[in-house]
C-alpha cells in the first residue's frame, strides 16, 4: 500500500516510524510545514518530521498552503492509497481529501468529540481532566468531525504537564496506529460517527489564557501552570516585569486569608502566594 504521511512536530515522528517499519506499506512521500527560523539566531530549521523522513530517504513536500493547485497536483502525482496525518498544522481541503482511494485518516490527541482543534492536550490539563486519549478517525471537511476508527484512553496524573502528556500521547498514538493498520489494510474497519452535539473545542492558547489571575481558585491555577508547561508558560508580573511560572505544588486546604496575589511566605521550597480559594 502506498501511503503519504503528513505531520510536523515531534508528536508525529513515532507514527511515521511505525509506517516506515510496516512491511506492507511504502511511504511514498511526507508532507510537513516549511522550515522556520528558530532560536535567538533565527536559524532556518527543518521540522522533526522532515528530519525523520530524510533519514529514510523519503521525498518531502513543504507547501506554504496545501490548497494551492500546484500543491494538490504534487500530492496526486504520488498516487497514495491512503493519507495519514498527525499534527500536520493545516486543514486538508476537499481536493486533497479526494485523492487517496482509501481516504485520509488522522491521529488526534483527544477522545473525540471532546477537544476538537489545535490544542487538545493543553486544554485537557488546564481544565483539570483526569484522563484524555488518542483517536484515529477518517478526515472530513469539518474540523476533526470525521467518523472514529479507534481510540485509547490515558490517565492524567497530578505530576503530569502538557509536556509529559505530549510524549505519552505521541507514543500511544503510534501504538494505536500499529494496532489499527491490519484492519485498515484488510478493509474491515467499522467506523463510528461522532456525537456532534457533545463536541468541545480546543483552540490554540491565547495570551490572555497564559496570564495568572490570582483571584481564581488555587486548584484552577495549579492546572493552568501544568497545562502551559513547557510551552508557552503561565505568567504573572512583578514590579512591571513578566515572570514565567513553570511549576507549583498541588494546593491543599489553607486558612490563610490574604488578598489574592499577596506573597505570604518565601522559603527554600518556593514562594507561597494567596489565591482566590486556598
Which stretches of residues belong to each language-model region?
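Internal alpha/beta domain cores that form substrate/cofactor-binding pockets in large enzymes
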Residues: 2-4, 27-31, 55-78, 83-85, ...
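Residue-level detector of anion-binding/catalytic polar loops
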Residues: 59, 131, 242
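An anion-binding loop in the catalytic cleft
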Residues: 21, 32, 215-278
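Donor/substrate-binding cores of folate-linked one-carbon enzymes
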Residues: 82-201
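Acyl-group handling in specialized metabolite and lipid biosynthesis
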Residues: 203-216
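Structural motif corresponding to alpha-helix initiation and N-cap regions
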Residues: 13, 43-46, 68-72, 118
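N-terminal beta-loop-helix "entrance" segment that forms/cooperates
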Residues: 36-56
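N-terminal Rossmann-like dinucleotide-binding module
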Residues: 1-41
Amino acid at each position: 500500500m502506498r501511503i503519504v504521511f503528513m505531520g510536523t512536530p515531534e508528536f508525529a515522528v513515532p507514527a511515521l516510524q511505525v509506517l516506515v517499519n510496516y512491511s506492507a506499506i511504502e511511504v511514498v512521500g511526507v508532507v510537513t510545514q516549511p522550515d522556520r527560523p528558530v532560536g535567538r539566531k533565527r536559524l532556518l530549521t527543518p521540522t522533526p518530521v522532515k528530519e525523520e523522513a530524510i533519514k529514510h530517504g523519503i521525498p518531502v513536500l513543504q507547501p506554504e498552503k496545501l490548497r494551492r493547485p500546484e500543491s494538490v497536483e504534487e500530492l496526486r502525482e504520488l498516487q497514495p492509497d491512503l493519507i495519514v496525518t498527525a499534527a500536520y498544522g493545516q486543514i486538508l481541503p476537499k481536493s486533497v481529501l479526494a485523492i487517496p482511494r482509501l481516504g485520509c485518516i488522522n491521529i488526534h490527541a483527544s477522545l473525540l468529540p471532546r477537544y476538537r482543534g489545535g490544542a487538545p492536550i493543553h486544554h485537557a490539563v488546564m481544565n483539570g481532566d483526569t484522563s484524555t486519549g488518542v483517536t484515529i478517525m477518517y478526515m472530513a471537511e469539518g474540523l476533526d468531525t470525521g467518523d472514529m476508527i479507534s481510540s485509547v484512553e490515558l490517565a492524567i496524573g497530578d505530576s503530569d504537564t502538557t509536556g509529559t502528556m505530549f510524549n505519552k500521547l505521541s507514543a500511544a498514538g503510534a501504538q494505536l496506529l500499529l494496532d489499527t493498520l491490519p484492519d485498515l489494510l484488510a478493509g474491515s474497519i467499522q467506523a463510528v460517527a461522532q456525537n456532534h452535539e457533545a463536541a468541545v473545542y480546543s483552540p490554540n492558547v491565547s495570551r490572555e489564557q497564559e496570564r495568572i489571575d490570582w483571584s481564581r481558585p488555587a486548584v484552577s491555577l495549579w492546572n493552568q501552570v501544568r497545562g502551559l508547561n513547557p510551552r508557552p508558560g503561565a505568567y504573572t508580573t512583578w514590579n512591571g516585569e513578566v515572570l514565567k511560572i513553570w511549576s507549583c505544588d498541588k494546593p491543599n486546604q489553607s486558612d490563610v486569608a490574604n488578598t489574592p496575589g499577596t506573597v505570604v511566605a518565601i522559603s527554600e521550597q518556593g514562594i507561597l502566594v494567596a489565591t482566590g480559594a486556598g
